[in-house]
Amino acid sequence: MNSKQRVYAFFWIFGLVNNVLYVVILSAAVDIVGPKVPKTLVLLMDITPSLLIKVTAPFFIKSIPYTMRIYALIALSCIGMIFVSGKSLLLCMIGIAMASVSSGFGEVSFLQLSHFFEENALNGWSSGTGGAGIVGSSVYMLLTSIFKLPIRLSLLSFTILPFAFLLYFKLDTTQIEYDSISSSGEETLIRNSNSNALQTDTFNESIRLSKTEEQNIFVSSIDHFKSTCVNLKALVVPYMLPLSSVYLFEYLINQAVSPTLLFPLDSRGLPPFFNKYRDMYVTYGTLYQLGVFISRSLAHKFRMHNLYFLSALQGLNLVLTILQAWIYIVHTPWPIMILIFYEGLLGGSSYVNTFLNVLEEVDMDKREFSLGAVSIADSLGVFIAALVGLGLEPTICNHQVSTGRPWCRME
């Protein structure tokens, strides 16, 4: 295995492990909260901490060494999944939040890390995140719907995966540097202060920054904040807005509409593993993730520079699925399953093409920052979807019950 293949393989694993717990938790949403609670509650807990991390990360993450980040990711992921596999709903929610922090922190970190290894690393990461979807959802479906293992045991089995982050230490990280907030910022001033302290005889003077230096630190921090906001603003229209809207549409489908895309269990032509209504929800999630995996793995070979076109297509998918849930146009799940798979293809393609556009169009000196910052967009779209879904799913379900289709209230 040459160096490029090695980098691709490692980043593929990083992408898979970083996202797989997020996928497993969403796949288990119907099992965690039951049929009567909106599944977007789990989505909200699964995305809010991640979004907060991504929004605030550009202001502080540069000062945290990658080594420390790796250990934090492992701890948060493992402890979080142990909590999720517990019996208490409150403990499950805390565990989901911890796994979410790990996912958001990991995505920003590895996207920034890919800057040092160029497009090869980003391709591996993108494919790996797509692989996380199909691995997480299909393995969970296999364990619970086919092998019929207990839900809690199935969730607990995923705690071993985060230790794969240790492969980071097998990378050539000599080229990675940790810069201070700015060349004239706090770190430089502290180093100068420490150097001057060696020339003094008084302990108090050795640890105290002068007023001038403190003022310089404050001014430098303000300048850094302003420049960060300016850089973020430049990324909104070309990259963040279309990516955010794609994720808004697809997660409304996945977590708010798909739990209501149900069919009678005694219908002819149902897949043999549709033994319960929750099996339909889990299957939709697996098909979506299969589409994401395929498109994230191949999208770099079929480039799409117009990101808003992908957003429009995903919006059309949302309209079609809402119509099906509301009117019950199709009476067999197969067309819906194909549509969900296609939805995944669009979502994965949008993700990869967004970050490839950043690599191709953003200046080298701003590329590392931009890759991490644009990752805010997908989480923001998912967060909005979670809020909207809290009302959308119950509305559709109540309508179905009133028209003689009570399946959304059944297990």
From Swiss-Prot:
Keyword Transmembrane helix assigned: yes
Entry keyword set: Amino-acid transport, Membrane, Signal, Transmembrane, Transmembrane helix, Transport, Vacuole
Record function comment: Involved in vacuolar transport and vacuole pH homeostasis. Also required for cytokinesis.
A cellular component term, taken from the record's GO annotations: fungal-type vacuole
Organism from which the protein derives: Candida glabrata (strain ATCC 2001 / BCRC 20586 / JCM 3761 / NBRC 0622 / NRRL Y-65 / CBS 138)
Any Pfam family: CLN3
One biological process term in Gene Ontology: lysine transport
Family per similarity comment: Belongs to the battenin family.
Localisation per UniProt entry: Vacuole membrane
InterPro entries for the chain: Battenin_disease_Cln3 (IPR003492), Battenin_disease_Cln3_subgr (IPR018460), MFS_trans_sf (IPR036259)
Transmembrane segments: 41-61, 79-99, 127-147, 149-169, 281-300, 307-329, 334-356, 371-391
Signal peptide: 1-29
Membrane topology note: Multi-pass membrane protein
Name of this chain's protein: Protein BTN1
